[in-house]
């Protein structure tokens, strides 16, 4: 509410400097996509980040709502991996498109035959709706969850996969992961 020539006026922008109004509206536009993907690790008792690091994959499952997000990733795509509430833990390149976890192989050995820290990734493996799915990843640089990297204001959300656009986060990640 403003007093303008003796009248009380309710306004938001019209008394502001018009250049400031333009700058505010431009700041709400999305930044262009960087070409890097944000991915969520989901180390939560179903899947293990240590297994993902060791055997070269990223997993999602528990329903097609979650696993279908992996369809966005193609061979050659660069990804940054994030663990909820902890920070960024990895940078890698997609080497294999989505496949059911029970069919994923590491050097011709089925994933389910390897010593896993979290066997629960095998849950519902005969149910295509609920099973875990993976994409192959050549991890270029990773950190244990206890050493996850973050800063105040770093981009993070609950999506399994999404386009990474935030300039400050990208700068931080490129430096941290030597990209």
Predicted regions located by residue number:
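Short, well-ordered loop/turn sites that connect or cap secondary structure elements
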Residues: 73-74
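Short, charged beta-turn/beta-strand-edge "cap" motif at the junction between a beta-strand
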Residues: 82-88
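Contiguous surface segments at macromolecular interaction interfaces
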Residues: 1-39, 43-44, 62-65, 103-179
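Short beta-strand-centered aromatic/proline hotspots
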Residues: 88-98
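Short, flexible loop/turn elements at secondary-structure junctions
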Residues: 43, 83, 96-98, 141
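Short, basic/aromatic beta-hairpin or loop at an interaction surface
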Residues: 44-60
